[in-house]
Amino acid sequence: AFQKWCKKRYKTIDAVNEAWGTAFWAQHMNDFSEIIPPRYIGDGNFMNPGKLLDYKRFSSDALKELYIAERDVLESITPGLPLTTNFMVSAGGSMLDYDDWGAEVDFVSNDHYFTPGEAHFDEVAYAASLMDGISRKEPWFQMEHSTSAVNWRPINYRAEPGSVV
């Protein structure tokens, strides 16, 4: 699927080589069939940044297509009901281009989890600002939020009194 996405985006393998700077990275390709998803190298070397960026774009596009397909089925059997999916917008970034997704949902929503440390309030404000942009200043919803322990963090910190609204 990544090969097809690259072919649609770049049209020629030479355009891929140019965009990814494969001459510098000694990764020149002669055919779209030579394109593979990025792999962990494990020796401390960096992976090709152009390829990584395009793989993130591909991943976002593929997941958005799946969301649209599911949304369209739901719209056909539940007309008039608003549909959305949870975004995970944070300062940590994401593989998904949520700004591109914003127009596909009936309302924008976010999941946000308590981040231990001094930057917690800054991170919450940053994520909220991003959500304002994605929603084009329309109201947006907070779908999930942790007020205490989660099962996926090795150490959980309690929220300071008054910090959870």
Q: Residue ranges of each PLM-predicted region?
A:
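Active-site clefts of carbohydrate-active enzymes
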Residues: 36-56, 112, 127-162
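Active-site phosphate/pyrophosphate- and oxyanion-stabilizing loops and adjacent acidic/basic residues
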Residues: 71-72, 128-129, 165
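Polysaccharide-binding and catalytic clefts of secreted carbohydrate-active enzymes
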Residues: 1-107, 111-124
